[in-house]
């Protein structure tokens, strides 16, 4: 009869999960024993970075990513990254070792005595099977839930003496060979009703969210915009983990502000607001105002029942975004409304003695290959990068929706591993780097050729901006003097350069993007926010 270990690896094969991101400990060694030749193990040096790599990998591939962590300490280290993965709707499947069953009652060293509670509420499913024979079924349960809409992370805790237990081969075959599909179609009546509301609207507008990209629905979203001459705003930056619409398209309106009052003010004059593939709305900070402009109605299309249920206003259709947009297009045959005026191009940036993050982003635009992927975690330069780059291909932009720092650096490594033929550029603030700095080692050790662009402003600029908005004065801990990321990365094996002028940035970026190894370019930039 097959062992639990053998069945589990066959289950992973069935789901295409033959790459494992991990940081092993003694409680995981029995699972990793005789590691299969057709599997790849990607070692990370700290668990938050491990989960971040898997998060990026899962998003860019659209498939579940496998993680293995070390009992309670390792899972604890990873919780912040699981929070990000949940916000990103990433199907990350986490296996965690535990002490042997015979020693759990006495709480021997490394016992995760309440394993299922540690990651809750940041996972869709968390479980420790009562019997060794139940491990493959529990993992299958987790995989199916992780990949059903809305996708999200899951965790299974497995005592270390379960792996050599034998189980029934027939039961194993049933577990392995199951298929579960979950793309829900919208109620036809609700689609017809929405189409009539769009036709009747005098000045409708759309807001495109990250799940358009995850669902592969760019083509349908562009077609809807062009069919009905809809302007399209991008999701507010805090929730804009992916792009749902090409930002070079003349119908693109820009990035919505992230607070209640400014959102309503920005959307004034529109009588119908169609929100696709996102929550309503990812607000932050708290700036009061009306939820909607006067006279406006809102309709949301989302695959996430919770996003629909928690929205404070408007109606919602819960269904697959791509299928729903396709069904909606069948009900529409053009419009007599005039097309919205073309959105202005990128703001021209002027040079100065100390260059700004905006200038660096404009230089990056000149070197960026057409098929490049951008991973961003520079909070003070997010809007500047979006404005300058105008990314216009699907599956090409990733940002941590959860707001927990550490996503960018680690996710970029996981994305580049998944997409070896596409250049990946990771734009980071030097503060963000520190939350997943060990991912530099993985990039160097596995020759993952990410170009890391570090904008060094020696402060938490976004926090100073929030302090102004919140009228908070005298807060400590907002400055980061003398933090030299280039030297840190070099210690992990990354070839690193510092560029202090626009000409130097131009030269170093050109060389980095042409290299087949990971490279880092650190640029000292002006303090403050970069909005354009």
Task: Annotate each predicted stretch with a short phrase.
Residues 209-213, 349, 429:
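Conserved short loop/turn motifs at secondary-structure junctions
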Residues 24-25, 96, 160, 236, ...:
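Short, small-residue-rich loop/turn micro-motifs
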Residues 5-18, 23-26, 31-33, 342-421:
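Active-site diphosphate/adenylate-binding microenvironment
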Residues 133, 171, 295-382, 500-532:
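Phosphate/pyrophosphate-binding active-site segments
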Residues 121-125, 176-178, 340-353, 492:
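Short glycine/proline- and acidic residue-enriched helix-loop micro-motifs
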Residues 95, 103-111, 258, 264-267, ...:
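Thiamine diphosphate
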């Amino acid at each position: 009869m097959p062992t639990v270990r053998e069945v589990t690896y066959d289950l992973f094969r069935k789901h295409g999960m033959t790459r494992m991101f991990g940081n092993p400990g003694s409680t995981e060694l029995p699972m990793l024993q005789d590691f299969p030749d057709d599997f790849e193990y990607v070692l990370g040096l700290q668990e938050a970075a491990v989960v971040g790599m898997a998060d990026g990998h899962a998003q860019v591939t659209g498939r579940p990513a496998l993680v293995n962590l070390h009992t309670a300490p390792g899972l604890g280290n990873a919780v912040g990254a699981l929070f990000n993965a949940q916000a990103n709707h990433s199907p990350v499947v986490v296996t965690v070792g535990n002490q042997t069953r015979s020693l759990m009652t006495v709480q021997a060293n490394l016992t995760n005595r309440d394993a299922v509670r540690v990651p809750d509420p940041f996972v869709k499913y968390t479980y420790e099977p009562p019997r060794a024979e139940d491990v493959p079924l529990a993992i299958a349960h987790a995989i199916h839930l992780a990949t059903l809409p809305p996708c999200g992370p899951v965790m299974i805790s497995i005592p270390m003496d379960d792996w050599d237990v034998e189980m029934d081969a027939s039961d194993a075959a049933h577990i392995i060979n199951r298929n579960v599909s979950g793309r829900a179609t919208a109620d036809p009546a609700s689609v017809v009703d929405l189409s009539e509301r769009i036709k009747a609207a005098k000045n409708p507008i759309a807001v495109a969210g990250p799940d358009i990209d995850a669902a592969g629905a760019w083509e349908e979203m562009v077609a809807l915009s062009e069919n009905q001459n809809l302007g399209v705003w991008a999701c507010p930056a805090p929730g804009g983990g992916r792009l749902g619409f090409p930002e070079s398209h003349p119908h693109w309106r820009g990035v919505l502000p992230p607070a209640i009052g400014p959102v309503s003010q920005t959307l004034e004059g529109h009588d119908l607001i169609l929100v696709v593939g996102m929550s309503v709305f990812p607000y932050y900070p708290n700036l009061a105002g009306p939820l909607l402009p006067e006279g406006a109605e809102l309709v949301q299309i989302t695959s996430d029942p919770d996003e629909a249920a928690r929205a404070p206003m408007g109606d919602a259709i819960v269904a697959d975004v791509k299928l729903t947009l396709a069904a909606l297009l069948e009900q529409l045959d053009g419009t007599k409304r005039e097309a919205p005026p073309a959105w202005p191009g990128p703001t021209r940036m002027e040079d100065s003695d100390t260059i700004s993050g905006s200038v660096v982003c404009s230089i990056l635009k000149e070197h960026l290959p057409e098929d490049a992927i951008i991973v961003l975690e520079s909070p003070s330069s997010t809007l500047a990068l979006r404005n300058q780059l105008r990314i216009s291909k699907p599956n090409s932009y990733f940002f941590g929706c959860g707001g927990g720092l550490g996503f960018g650096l680690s996710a970029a490594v996981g994305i580049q591993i998944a997409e070896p033929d596409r250049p990946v550029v990771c734009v980071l603030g030097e503060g963000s780097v520190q939350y997943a700095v060990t991912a530099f080692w993985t990039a160097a050790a596995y020759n993952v050729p990410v170009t890391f662009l570090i904008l060094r402003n020696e402060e938490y600029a976004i926090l100073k901006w929030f302090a102004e908005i919140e009228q908070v004065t005298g807060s400590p801990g907002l400055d980061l003097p003398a933090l030299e990321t280039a030297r840190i990365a070099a210690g992990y094996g990354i070839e690193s350069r510092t560029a202090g002028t626009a000409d130097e940035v131009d030269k170093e970026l050109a060389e980095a993007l042409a290299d087949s190894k990971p490279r880092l370019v650190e640029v000292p930039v002006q303090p403050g926010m970069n909005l354009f």
